[in-house]
A protein has these predicted regions:
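Tryptophan-centered motif/residue detector
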Residues: 187, 194, 303-309, 313
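Membrane-helix boundary elements
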Residues: 204-216, 232-235
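Membrane-embedded multi-pass helical conduit in multi-pass membrane proteins
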Residues: 220-305
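Membrane-water interface at loop-to-transmembrane-helix junctions
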Residues: 145-146, 212-222
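Cytosolic juxtamembrane C-terminal amphipathic helix followed by a basic/polar low-complexity tail immediately after
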Residues: 307-338
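A broadly tuned preference for mixed-charge, low-complexity surface segments
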Residues: 101-110, 130-134, 171-179, 219-234, ...
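Non-transmembrane catalytic domains and loops of membrane-associated enzymes and transporters
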Residues: 1-209, 337-339
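Hydrophobic alpha-helical segments and helix-packing faces
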Residues: 180, 184-187, 195, 214, ...
Length: 339
């Protein structure tokens, strides 16, 4: 209903843009999830490029115009735009995420783009060649992992289909902003979901990334192994070494501090932002909290529940837990009667 209202306003107030001829919206008869909605959009699209955006993305007026520029290269299969944080100054959590987004997009994705091998065309704003999306549509919609239907991680999954045989890039001038979680429970659920999808899709990408430019391949495999082994490395340096060898982990702590300072210095020099100190805070928070989500992701990466919204998989998971709770209650009641 809200979309319908917005479209009517556009038709009435933006007549010179001919929105009646250029803008259409479709409502799925049944809520089949985000992937199905994106696939439907690709099916009805009239031109050779399709743009995917998240429902909480705010696009710069020239975002799409800038986003499509790299497609002058006929081998280019997909391009990611830049995502900034819209609610940076809400609290310390959003400030930390703002620092992380800056590093993730303007440093890491920009580096990958140098080799035309961006590993994740992020959901807030990305563009694909329609023919590639339609070619892999059925595989994408019906993707399973360890027998479980894949729901989240649709951006990484589609990126893998594209990256396998095409180039992927990052366009820094195609800017959008997004609302990030400002409460820790929601944030932690989001991070767990992202880690599971990262692990799943990184394992998939590992089967073909070796065919890319050698430097890209080496950095990809290092980037895959290091986060997986990071909890072991931390335990070894902060617990095993001090207890067994009675040596203070100076080298490890100095390295951690230098990494945190690098994030802060980048914010201070390149962005000239007052949030620069939260680069240091984020690194410490990552080591203390987020790092320990990875072992959980190892043993639950097959799970497809969203965590922060009600998907069919979340509803099914709740139903199973409720059934288990009821069975346990019945057993306890039977035991009490026997006593």
């Amino acid at each position: 209903e809200k979309i319908d209202e917005i479209v009517r306003i556009l038709h009435n107030e933006a007549e010179r843009y001919k929105t009646k001829d250029r803008l259409s919206y479709y409502v799925q008869s049944v809520n089949q999830g985000k992937r199905a909605a994106l696939a439907r959009g690709a099916e009805v699209a009239k031109h050779e490029l399709v743009v995917f955006v998240d429902s909480d993305s705010f696009l710069d007026p020239f975002a799409i115009r800038n986003l499509v520029q790299p497609f002058v290269d006929l081998k280019m299969g997909g391009v990611a735009g830049r995502t900034d944080v819209a609610n940076t100054y809400t609290n310390s959590l959003t400030k930390m995420q703002s620092v992380r987004y800056y590093i993730s997009f303007r440093i890491m994705k920009a580096a990958e783009a140098y080799f035309d091998a961006v590993s994740c065309l992020s959901g807030p704003l990305s563009c694909y060649r329609k023919e590639i999306v339609l070619e892999h549509k059925e595989e994408w919609l019906n993707q399973t992992f360890f027998g479980q239907k894949a729901t989240f991680g649709d951006d990484r999954s589609m990126t893998n289909f594209v990256l396998k045989n095409h180039r992927t890039n990052y366009q820094d001038t195609a800017v959008c902003s997004t609302i990030v979680p400002n409460e820790y429970p929601v944030f932690l659920k989001q991070q767990m979901r992202w880690k599971r999808s990262w692990l799943r899709e990184s394992l998939m990408a590992g089967s073909f990334i070796w065919r890319k430019e050698p430097f890209v391949s080496v950095m990809f495999y290092i980037g895959l192994v290091v986060p997986i082994l990071a909890p072991v490395v931390v335990i070894y340096n902060l617990i095993y070494i001090p207890i067994v060898h009675r040596v203070f982990p100076t080298t490890f702590l100095v390295g951690l501090l230098m990494m945190a300072l690098m994030m802060s210095v980048v914010q201070l020099i390149l962005r000239k932002s007052s949030t620069w100190v939260f680069g240091l805070v984020f690194c410490l928070y990552y080591e203390a909290v987020l790092l320990w989500q990875m072992p959980i992701a190892w043993v639950t990466f097959w799970k497809s529940t969203w965590g922060t919204r009600e998907t069919p998989q979340d509803i099914e998971e709740k139903r199973k837990k409720e059934e288990q709770r009821q069975r346990k209650a019945v057993r306890l009641e039977e035991q009490s009667e026997q006593e």
